[in-house]
């Protein structure tokens, strides 16, 4: 009788340890995916809001390299006007991510709210106040890489 009780307790403990191990593994995977989404969205926002007219071609390519889906298609069509406008206006903007957090996750897609500060340099003006924006960035994971698939400025 004691042997049967010992076996039952042993099986229950093994089941509990297995379940706890699985839950820890699942939590680790969710944290890894959350970090991947937040990092990709933050980098995508910084890429989008950092432009130097002297390197506008490289800046536009950097945006495309971190994009996928409809955002990639849309920016690809507007890439040349983005470059031309940056050069014409002699834009020098530096976007810095001040905070970011995952709003929702659905499979291989996540939506991240990103707060950014954008500072501009204009030699004609002595002092320029930074601009503060919030951007909702949708990120799509393909394989081990996550890229920006949509960007919406939040009022």
What are these regions (language model features)?
Residues 1-26:
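Amphipathic, hydrophobic N-terminal targeting peptides for secretion and organelle import
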Residues 88-122:
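Surface-exposed, charged secondary-structure patches
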Residues 21-37:
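Ser/Thr/Pro/Gly-rich low-complexity linker/stalk segments immediately outside membranes or between
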């Amino acid at each position: 009788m004691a042997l049967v009780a010992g076996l039952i307790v042993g099986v229950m403990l093994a089941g509990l340890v297995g379940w706890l191990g699985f839950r820890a593994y699942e939590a680790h995977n969710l944290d890894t995916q959350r970090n991947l989404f937040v990092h990709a969205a933050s980098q995508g926002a910084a890429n989008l809001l950092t432009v130097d007219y002297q390197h506008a071609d490289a800046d536009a390519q950097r945006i495309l390299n971190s994009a996928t889906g409809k955002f990639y298609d849309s920016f690809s069509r507007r890439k040349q006007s983005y470059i031309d406008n940056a050069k014409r206006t002699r834009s020098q903007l530096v976007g810095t991510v001040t905070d970011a957090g995952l709003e929702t996750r659905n499979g291989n897609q996540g939506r991240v709210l990103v707060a950014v500060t954008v500072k501009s340099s204009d030699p004609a003006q002595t002092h320029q106040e930074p601009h503060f924006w919030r951007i909702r960035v949708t990120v799509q994971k393909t394989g081990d890489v996550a890229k920006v698939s949509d960007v919406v400025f939040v009022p």
